[in-house]
Regions:
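Bacterial N-terminal signal peptides that target proteins for export
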Residues: 1-16
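Bacterial N-terminal signal peptides
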Residues: 12-26
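Formylglycine-dependent sulfatase
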Residues: 28-432, 436-466, 470-477
Length: 477
């Protein structure tokens, strides 16, 4: 019998190995839904039509809410940006993973992120928009901490499981994101400039997965600039028939808000600040509509789970800023309802029944356990996870949460259950107790009327805080 040359045997074995790897990836990915997490920046609970706003036009988000499940009590894990974002990808409270407030800490390599976990299940992963979980460059002065001043906080998306990214460290203007008009130092808004010669660099860059600064196609509406990168990522995955996990974290309507002429004209009867605030939200809404239309055109809408929320409540004082938390008390940076209760939707035509609303409290930390449950992956068991799977809720089989949600931010504390909320302002000695079902505006303190309930909830909160402190000390790894 004639034997094959060694090189032929080696090549044959190599191709067999490739076939095995490809087959394994296909097997892991078979039947698994695509997943997209959409988040706005500083969008208030009352800033959308589906929560009753009569001024700001959000027809695409309203249609998404009508086509899916709307959360009346969806919470950001923190009243500011970075901590909430980290909760989305870890399922953990910010104090556990070391980003307790905005522009503090970074995503540690020891943390398990959704992108890392989903890659093991055959997903391609992409991040588009605001990152805010670490610096994106070690060499160039960028944004709040980028460059030599923030080397210890270098933790870009590609170091946390993302195959592709088009990301900023932090905020940018919502129109011409890399530019600021010369001579204009406003922190709130300005009119769009038509000529780049009239502008100077804003100071925050977009970076890709190769660590390169990206400047092409960055003029005009920032939400469109972001979606221009997210859609090709989705198209490529759909062509390969590979499940995708995409994060689309818009900058709008974080200050400075700048809308283009078409969108400010929609709100011509309002003050300039409001025109830009409302306009950039409508521009963002159009990009959500564009994404939903693209999923339908690609034939993958029924196989794609779309989550939508905001990272915290609206910026500024209620009597001087255009954003609104509607009837809720408090705003950004507060653990009162208006600071952490945010718009929330999930749409999945293939599984989630349309036109449903839930009053069950849910939180951004629920994303990770929910997604792992949806794809039938093993839950994380080697460290505390604060979120819970919402799959029973998506399927219409959950009557109540039964697992309170804990909050801590700069001295403020809150413990929120299905009905009651325990709250303590930073520096205060006593807790307040609110019945959120009867009193969502938190006007009536029940702590003195129901001391036993307040004590029981306070004990639960302290036990949870003790667990978070163990995690913060690095003992989970």
């Amino acid at each position: 019998m004639t034997s094959l040359p060694p090189i032929v045997v080696g090549v044959s074995r190599f191709f067999c190995f490739l076939l095995f790897v490809v087959g394994l990836a296909d097997g892991l990915a078979a039947g698994k839904p695509n997943i997209v997490l959409i988040m706005c920046d500083d969008l208030g609970w009352g800033d959308v039509g589906f929560n009753g706003n009569k001024i700001i036009r959000t027809p695409h988000l309203d249609a998404m809410a009508k086509a899916g499940l709307k959360f009346n009590r969806f919470y950001a894990a923190a009243p500011v940006c970075s901590p909430t974002r980290g909760s989305c990808v870890t399922g953990r409270h910010p104090y556990r993973y070391g980003i307790p407030f905005a522009n503090s800490g970074h995503m540690k390599p020891e943390e398990l992120t959704l992108a890392e976990l989903l890659k093991k299940q055959g997903y391609t992963t992409g991040h588009f928009g605001k990152w805010h979980l670490g610096t994106l460059t070690k060499t160039v002065k960028d944004s709040n901490r980028g460059g030599l001043r923030g080397v210890k906080h270098f933790s870009p998306p590609q170091a946390n499981g993302f195959d592709f990214c088009f990301s900023t460290e932090s905020k940018v203007p919502t129109w011409d994101p890399l530019l600021r008009p010369k001579g204009n130092n406003s922190k709130k808004w300005w009119d769009a400039v038509s000529n780049a010669g009239e502008a100077k660099p804003y100071g925050t860059a977009y970076w890709n997965e190769r660590g390169e600064s990206v400047t092409e196609n960055t003029r005009g509406d920032d939400s469109r600039v972001i979606m221009d990168r997210a859609i090709p990522f989705i198209r490529g995955a759909a062509r390969r028939e590979q499940p995708f996990f995409g994060i689309v974290w818009f900058h709008a309507p974080h200050l400075p808000v700048v809308a283009g002429p078409r969108h400010t004209a929609m709100y011509a009867g309002h003050p300039n600040y409001a025109q830009h605030y409302y306009g950039c939200i409508t521009a963002l809404d159009e990009q959500v509509g564009r994404l939903r239309a693209e999923l339908r055109a690609l034939g993958v809408a029924d196989d794609t789970v779309l989550f939508f929320c905001s990272d915290n409540g609206p910026e500024g004082q209620a009597d001087s800023a255009p954003g609104t938390a509607a009837h809720l008390s408090g705003r950004k940076r507060s653990l009162l309802e208006g600071g952490i209760r945010v718009p929330g939707i999930v749409e999945w035509p293939g599984r989630v029944k349309a036109d449903r609303t839930t009053d069950i409290p849910c939180v951004t930390s629920d994303y990770l356990p929910t997604i792992l449950d949806l794809i039938e992956a093993k839950p994380i068991s080697d460290r505390p996870i604060d979120g819970m799977s919402l799959v029973p809720l998506l399927d219409g089989k959950l009557a109540k949460r039964d697992r309170p949600i804990g909050f801590e931010s700069k001295g403020q504390l809150a413990w929120i259950g299905d009905r009651y909320k325990l709250y303590r302002k930073g520096g205060a000695a006593e807790f307040k107790l609110f019945d959120l079902v009867a009193d969502p505006s938190e006007k009536n303190d029940l702590a003195k009327a129901q001391p036993r309930l307040a004590k029981r909830l306070a004990d639960q909160l302290e036990a949870w805080r003790a667990s978070c402190q163990v995690s913060a000390a690095g003992k989970d790894y």
